[in-house]
């Protein structure tokens, strides 16, 4: 068991399956505990996601743990997500170990021997438990994948190592909640089942009173208390973990609603950092559509090519489906096109991968909408950055995560004047803008999180656009989330589980 220099507690949030809401439950508890005066930090031993972010000291971790750290009001560190797997094919992923790129592994190769990853995860957990009063541990997928159980260091092995009590989260919205909970508990070894101290039923729709007997039945069948039934709620804008959120409009039958600012984003097979678009998705003046399949883009004001973990592969996919013709037609009609990171690279002339960073070495012809040449290099750029959108007063801030180095010709103007990276002064240029200002690209993720950039961009699409007088900031969203969960959880029992007094 991990030994801390002071009395430390761990609470593990495990799931009956993937996407049952573990991340959002952990985020809510981080803010609830912090509001109660507890020094709390998040932890997830291994995350599989192309939605990552950069810590203040230049390390890459899952976006979910950055969000949880913000909710806990602590500085995010690599120890909060020591192993990050970034899928770049159907069977392989880049491994980021304690914040830095380590290797590229096939699924079979990764699971052949997990001792290196497990030891790094243990070291990080030990450091967190030495620094913080409570560590909220998020599990991965189902905590009861019995065919992988002996190699799973993310769920119950972490709980045993930290001495954590476990709360099991089930998603009633997908149906079969009794099977989820009872089935999960039934297959667990007795020593691990004994660690489960409570159950949370997530995403309930309708009148909770109608499920009171369901709660009693679950408690009778399992002998474990149900700590809360959480109603489905969309009133907060908090980044999703590793997939475009279920609320997103993907390949809708029609175009954008009349009166809305229509924005289309190409939904690449290896889309990354889709949370770059969250501020647009949550703006009531905007209708954002994620599109897999080519269609006429008439009715949309802008097309966004988001990030990609396999840029050349996704570019080949784009060509194979016939997207190029629709993109060029949209360009010819005066539509505004923006590329972010990998999407920016696709807007250039070519993408060269001489070292086979994303697969086979080679060069792929790009869309040639910006006069830019990109080479994928072996070293990854990881930075939090600030600057100004050139020619405007919009203050840009975001983060960079890319292997590419792009050279911009004089036919384009730079997009952003970078004034700082990782809190060090800089005077550099980022991105490119076409001569008519209708095509642009940048390496900055989270550009639209900055209200001045969002105002500038949407004003290009609709001159009458104005930001809402009161847009929910991230901290306000965490408070709304904490209030929502607090109203439906038995906090006295939860504080008792972590041996703390709830006041």
From Swiss-Prot:
UniProt-recorded Gene Ontology molecular function terms: ABC-type vitamin B12 transporter activity; catalytic activity
Pfam families the UniProt entry points to: CbiA, GATase_3
NCBIfam families: cobQ, PRK00784.1
Family note: Belongs to the CobB/CobQ family. CobQ subfamily.
Domain of life: Bacteria
Entry annotation: catalytic residues: 341, 445
Protein name per Swiss-Prot or TrEMBL: Cobyric acid synthase
Domain GATase cobBQ-type intervals: 260-453
The encoding gene: cobQ
An example Gene Ontology biological process: cobalamin biosynthetic process
